[in-house]
A protein has these predicted regions:
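Domain-level signal for soluble alpha/beta catalytic cores
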Residues: 9, 162-172
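Carbohydrate-binding surface patches
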Residues: 179-188
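Noncatalytic carbohydrate-binding groove/subsite architecture in carbohydrate-active enzymes
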Residues: 1-111
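A structural motif corresponding to the C-terminal end of an alpha-helix
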Residues: 3-4, 61-72, 119-131, 172-180
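Aromatic/acidic polysaccharide-binding cleft in carbohydrate-active enzymes
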Residues: 75-164
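Amphipathic alpha-helical segments in well-structured domains
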Residues: 30, 53-56, 117, 162-166
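Generic, ordered loop/turn and secondary-structure boundary motif
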Residues: 18, 144-145, 173
Length: 188
């Protein structure tokens, strides 16, 4: 703190909750604690990816119990993997498949990622997180189309400038600071 007075310091893991759980940060040292989530670590089929949203309340509650009242920020999270804490690299996915620990996932460019991102944001709001980062502006976890080294069917050669998740982020940004309203379905 002497070297950088007034600078906010965060601690945690650049990877997932699992690593934070294995090596929790000491309380009172950081101004916020962070980790990321990735739904394609263990399985990459559509149902399994959406089911990862069901684990978030437990992850958020466990993290909160470790860190007390320290602000809780969820780092950049999307369907593709940013890094592989379990190996040398993330898996390549030039064929646009559904691949575990892949650096690129075609669902990130579609309605699937928009729905998953909204589910993540809703779980984070219910979990009392102080800030979240969903994906990235461009690239494999991006919300804005840019030509890439991998094929992006429908977007390459098309007129679309943004992916559906962009609209989720824009809507969430417009509601920043608004009161959260809990709703429940009778189809439990």
């Amino acid at each position: 703190r002497r070297a950088f007075p007034g600078v906010t310091r965060g601690g945690g893991m650049l990877s997932y909750f699992t690593e934070l759980n294995r090596k929790p940060v000491p309380r009172g040292v950081f101004d916020f604690v962070t980790h990321t989530v990735c739904p394609i670590v263990h399985a990459a089929d559509d149902i399994s990816v959406m089911e990862t949203l069901e684990s978030l309340p437990s992850i958020f509650a466990s993290t909160r119990s470790m860190m007390g009242k320290t602000p809780y920020h969820l780092g950049p999270s999307g369907i593709p993997c940013r890094d592989n804490p379990y190996g040398a690299a993330v898996a390549g996915n030039s064929e646009n498949g559904r691949v575990c620990l892949a650096d690129m996932d075609p669902r990130q460019r579609g309605l699937f990622a928009a729905a998953w991102s909204l589910g993540l944001a809703a779980a984070a709001a219910r979990g009392g997180l102080d800030a979240i980062a969903l994906g990235a502006a461009t690239g494999p976890q991006g919300v804005i189309y840019r030509k890439a080294s991998y094929a992006q069917p429908w977007f390459d050669g098309g007129n679309a400038a943004v992916y559906p998740a962009y609209h989720v982020l824009a809507g969430l940004a417009a509601m920043s600071g608004a009161k959260r309203l809990d709703v429940a379905s009778s189809n439990s």
